[in-house]
Amino acid sequence: MKNQIKKEILILGNGYIGNRLHEELDVELSDKRIHSLADVEDEIKRFKPAIIINCIGYTGSDVDDCELNKDKTLTANTFIPIILGEAALRNKIKLIHISSGCIYHFDYSGDKPIAEDKIPDFFELFYSRTKIYTEVALRALSKVSPNLIIRIRVPLDNRPHPRNLLTKLIKYKKIIDIPNSITYVPDFIKALKHLIEINANGIYNVCNKGALRYPELLDVYKKYVPDFEYTVIDYKELNLVRTNLLLSTRKLEESGFKVRQIKDVFEECVKGYLKY
């Protein structure tokens, strides 16, 4: 990414994704907690960005925690992104909002991978509802203030972190075996750079092609850590409300970005992970 573009970018939200982007993009990261439009305006005056990447969000320890902390969830996942959208409009700044693909029902027996223009329909989790509310608002704002909404799904990374899918699976020991769309974080960062460089607007699913079945990834991990053991259980045994789905990557590919198959990153991911 060109140095001039880097100088114009400000990241808000210093959690997992925000810090990964800060590290890889080498751009400004605000450490200020945003509570109001005035807070955003202060950061805009301080950094003078042309692009704001919003990585602010709340999931708690997991999405079930959002059911217990609806105030925090609604504030971080809906209220603040809408404030950022208003600030972007007022200051003629582009907003890039990091969203989630966990907003759909999916029927594995007949559905095709979900494209960006399908209307979100998964309201069973409060977390998902807050993500949907935000997308509706930002899509309305986009008619007068172009923005970019990036949907990622179940981040998988090549370094340990509590939010990393591989870290979670190693900890769980008992896992389900359902194909899911996954976002490999190093590829997500490359895709984000690409979308910034082509000045993309609208909604993009940013995940890898194909589907990940958790045992496939853990079998690669077990190849390098032979003592590791895991058990596959039936999804119903979890007794939890979750989204399991496949997202289409066609739009991202048609933008000129080469999307890798998720299965092609397993070795790279595990080898990188074990170096830490």
Which residues fall in each region the model found?
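N-terminal Rossmann NAD(P)H-binding glycine-rich loop of SDR-like oxidoreductase domains
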Residues: 2-25
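Mid/C-terminal beta-alpha module of Rossmann-like enzyme folds, strongest
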Residues: 191-244
